[in-house]
């Protein structure tokens, strides 16, 4: 009996999360057809996805008619909105919530049955107003709106963990001690940040290696995760073990120095982006390390979903295991 392929449309397809989802689904051509929404189909990132087999559709999230047309015929949509899009910083322009609501409404009009939405925890609510993070709070508000519609047969919110890819950006390394790019006066690559909070269970995520597979796993059987917040991560570890892993694979002097006594002592140098980083540490400390909300951090669902996705690949010698922090550092930084 021939299996019917399901059409999945990815909004934010050229971003880190969306690209990972597209690439994973394209490895299972008997299960899924992939449509990638982009503002610029001629961009290098979009063309890369086209070469791999994605069908490109040009559409802008600010235009309801374009979005409805882009979603036509789709069984499922993966939605991630770039919170750092400059359009959201214009006080006269639309907010991220406006975008999210418009896109969700368009998916409903188009008859989409399944929505996997990249969300965030309700930071202000969970910290009783002590800490606010615009991007997390807004994503959570969009999630609540999607829930309130009752329009989707399967609605799966997913929260990505702490991106390992953040370590690839040299520009901001100095604010956190220099790790993994700049040595300090004593010759160490120092990771100098506040404690995470609680039991120091940091959910590191390799977006490129694992996030797409985790979403892929959800789409294999979305009803199992309907209205459940999926925690997406590659490995749970603490900062001490993280820096030790880096030292072992690179041979470089590396250490973790906690900023004490609390997250409030972290110096953001008056930079708004770094203030958000500071608030993130505030959020996790104030919630005792519960980055994903009220539930404790747990990687079992991510492990299961990763394994399901790899089994769905048409051809693969890939391990069904999630990428470890050590293996990620070895690939990206070992000589």
Swiss-Prot record:
It comes from the Eukaryota. Gene3D superfamilies: NAD(P)-binding Rossmann-like Domain, UDP-galactose 4-epimerase, domain 1. InterPro entries: NAD(P)-bd_dom_sf, NmrA-like, NmrA-like_oxidored. GO terms for molecular function: oxidoreductase activity. Its EC number is 1.-.-.-. Residues 161-206 are annotated as: Interaction with ASS1. The keyword NADP applies. Pathway: Secondary metabolite biosynthesis. NADP(+) binds at residues 12-17, 39-43, 60-61, 81-88, 139, 163-166. GO terms for cellular component: nucleus. Keywords: NADP, Oxidoreductase. Belongs to the NmrA-type oxidoreductase family. NmrA-like family domain-containing oxidoreductase; part of the gene cluster that mediates the biosynthesis of the indole diterpenes penitrems. The geranylgeranyl diphosphate (GGPP) synthase ptmG catalyzes the first step in penitrem biosynthesis via conversion of farnesyl pyrophosphate and isopentyl pyrophosphate into geranylgeranyl pyrophosphate (GGPP). Condensation of indole-3-glycerol phosphate with GGPP by the prenyl transferase ptmC then forms 3-geranylgeranylindole (3-GGI). This is NmrA-like family domain-containing oxidoreductase ptmS. The gene is ptmS.
């Amino acid at each position: 009996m021939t299996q019917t392929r399901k059409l999945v449309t990815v909004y934010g397809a050229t971003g880190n999360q969306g690209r990972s989802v597209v690439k994973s689904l394209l490895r299972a051509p008997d299960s899924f057809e992939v449509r990638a929404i982009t503002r610029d189909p001629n961009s290098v990132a979009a063309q890369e996805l086209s070469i791999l087999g994605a069908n490109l559709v040009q559409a802008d999230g600010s235009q309801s008619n374009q979005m409805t047309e882009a979603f036509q015929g789709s069984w499922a949509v993966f939605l991630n909105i770039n919170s750092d899009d400059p359009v959201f910083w214009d006080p006269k322009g639309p907010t991220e919530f406006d975008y999210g609501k418009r896109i969700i409404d368009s998916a409903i009009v188009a008859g989409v049955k399944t929505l996997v939405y990249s969300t965030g925890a309700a930071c202000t609510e969970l910290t009783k107003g002590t800490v606010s993070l615009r991007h997390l709070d807004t994503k959570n508000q969009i999630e609540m709106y999607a829930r309130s519609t009752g329009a989707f047969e399967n609605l799966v919110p997913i929260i990505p963990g702490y991106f390992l890819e953040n370590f690839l950006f040299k520009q901001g390394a100095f604010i956190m001690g220099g790790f993994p790019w700049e040595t300090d006066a004593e010759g160490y690559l120092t990771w100098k940040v506040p404690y995470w909070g609680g039991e120091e269970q940091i959910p590191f995520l390799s977006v490129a290696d694992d996030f797409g597979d985790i979403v892929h796993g959800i789409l294999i059987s979305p009803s199992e995760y309907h209205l459940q917040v999926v925690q997406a991560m590659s490995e749970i570890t603490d900062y001490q073990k993280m820096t030790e892993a880096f030292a072992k694979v690179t041979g470089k002097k590396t250490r973790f120095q906690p900023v004490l006594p609390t997250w409030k002592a972290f110096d953001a140098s008056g930079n708004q982006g770094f203030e958000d980083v500071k608030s993130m540490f505030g959020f996790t400390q104030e919630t005792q390390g519960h980055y994903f909300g009220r539930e404790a951090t747990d990687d079992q669902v991510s492990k299961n979903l990763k394994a399901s996705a790899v089994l769905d690949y048409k051809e693969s010698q890939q391990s069904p295991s999630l990428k470890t922090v050590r293996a990620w550092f070895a690939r990206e930084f070992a000589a």
